[in-house]
Amino acid sequence: MERIVITGALGQIGTELVLKCREIYGNDNVLATDIREPEEDSPVNNGPFEVLDVTNREAMMAIVENFKADTLMHMAALLSATAEKNPLLAWDLNMGGLMNALETARTYELHFFTPSSIGAFGDSTPKKDTPQNTIQQPTTMYGVNKVAGELLCQYYFTKFGVDTRSVRFPGLISHVKEPGGGTTDYAVEIYFEAVRKGRYTSYIAKDTYMDMMYMDDAIDAIIKLMEADSDKLVTRNGYNLSAMSFEPEQIKAEIQKHYPGFALDYEVDPVRQAIADSWPDNIDTSYSRKEWGFNPKYDLAGMTELMLKAIEEKEQNK
């Protein structure tokens, strides 16, 4: 990878992916794009930026051609809870954008990455140690998009030889950008509210286990997969990824080691709870570890300490 275009660069993953790629490959070699201009204080302002609507294929191709890109990381998407509220928009953006990105990758012979998700699984999937290859019958529009996306990426690799690669992300936890529209977002919000208010009301019920990962591990995984030898990638599209699995009470216990008075109560959102209930409790990541060396660094305790310290600094500097 030498010249990288990233769509959805102002999103939760995109923002940090842009920064890490610029750190490794150089600021001027990573072009950030999104549907809107960044705020003045956005961290992505440290390098080139273009406004891009991913549903406009001609505009996407023009940006890739003008930048002389060799890699396209397609991160633009409507997330799970938001997609469920507006399924037609989700299909148009998530699938239309992906098709345009894949066609762009085919036309310009690009290395290609796009994220899938644990949302690609459903009620009929084994919930414990969910295998890499298993039943995928999601009950949400977001999940349907992700399953279709995995199949499309594999199709473009098999049919056209496009170097497609993707991972099934769990919930991703970060202090850099506050989340929006995801089912696992409670696991980010809880840290911000612990620092700001000393309490949190969870929309996800007690004893609801979901796979999670600290954002630094997620970004490192993308780059490690993209730098891996293509010949060693057997699975290629939709690698299971996770660093930990927990439920709300376990985060509370870790936060209370730093904030003993922290209080947690519940006001369950039936839409997001139903989505969470359809997902695995924990997934098998052995294929990712074996084929390209996935090895996350952070567990719940380490992540909690980092999150609280970082948010405390943010709040003090406001």
UniProtKB/Swiss-Prot annotation:
Pfam families: Epimerase. Gene3D superfamilies: NAD(P)-binding Rossmann-like Domain. InterPro entries: Epimerase_deHydtase (IPR001509), NAD(P)-bd_dom_sf (IPR036291), NAD(P)_epim/dehydratase (IPR051225). GO terms for molecular function: L-threonine 3-dehydrogenase activity. This is Uncharacterized epimerase/dehydratase SH2450. Disulfide bonds: none annotated. GO terms for biological process: threonine catabolic process. It comes from Staphylococcus haemolyticus (strain JCSC1435). Belongs to the NAD(P)-dependent epimerase/dehydratase family.
